[in-house]
Amino acid sequence: MTIERIFLARQPGGALLEFQHILVLAGAGIEGDRYFNAKGEAGQNITLVEAEVIEEFNATFGTRHELSCTRRNLVTRGVRLSLLVGKEFIVGNVRLRGVELCEPCMGLGKSMASEAVTPASVVKYLVHRAGIRADVLSSGTISTGAEFSIAA
């Protein structure tokens, strides 16, 4: 159970940038990310998606989407993220709490659509599989290759 890729965007709708390491701050999220220190709703600190879901989507629909296509911050491998909603877990040395499923929107559907798959089909396929939103409970660094564990 590891972090495979790390992305952030400096502004909403801005280009995604890939990093090997990111600094995350408790209650604020990823330093430099578009949602850093966003207030109002729980789960805005950081988002995660399973690499396997994107790979399965590509295999099912014959597409070639990159792992950044969902615009989630962390791309994981070997962990079923939906099982982490309501639980605390550790990535590297950072403690997180899964807040909610990050359900797909029509914007994501449109961005992943192709001649072979409609936006509505994208959304339908990704329901309950498009990742999770999490709160950052402790500050630290997350790096590609970082291991996951369930908090005790």
Where are these regions (language model features)?
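Metal-cofactor-dependent catalytic cores
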Residues: 1-152
